[in-house]
Amino acid sequence: MIARVISSVLIVWALGFVWFASTLPQPAGIAQTDAIVVPTGSGGRIPRGIALLRAGAADKMLVTGVDVDVRPIEFMAEFGVDQRLMDCCITLGFSALDTRGNARETAEWIADNDYRSLRLVTADWHMRRTAVELADRLPAEVRVLRDGVPTQPSFATLFGEYHKLLAAWLLTLA
């Protein structure tokens, strides 16, 4: 009996990993949201967020998890952002150190600005855990549009992220 339970758990775990690795979230269309949120991390996230902002997918963007040593002028130079766009539309968040912190920082920013919808822009392999952490912090009425940035993650990245997702999901149940 114990062997069957263990075998069943292992099968569910393995199938879950196959599902996780083979169905990574894709970019969303150009649907309008109140804001765009981009956690710092792997390449492509911030350029995707800026492109969406410029295309009118939202009026404001939060980049969460920015290193405290990064100055806005450096951010602007790195990502080709002009002063007008920076002043009107981009907020740099400096308080988050990890994905959970990104969710906390995002929830505070969303509440402070009374937004009802946001586009979450992050790496495809990072999307599910970020969304779980964010859903745990946001009011249920805030709509989150998932916009995955395509990457070529290694097996190790996928394997590690799958387990972080499981842990995040279990923590939300507690």
Positions of the model-derived regions?
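A structural signal for short, hydrophobic/glycine-enriched beta-strand patches
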Residues: 21-159
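Hydrophobic membrane-insertion alpha-helices, especially the h-region
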Residues: 3-19
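A transmembrane-helix-recognition feature enriched in membrane-embedded lipid enzymes
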Residues: 155-174
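Structural signal for membrane-spanning alpha-helices in multi-pass inner-membrane proteins
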Residues: 17-24, 168-172
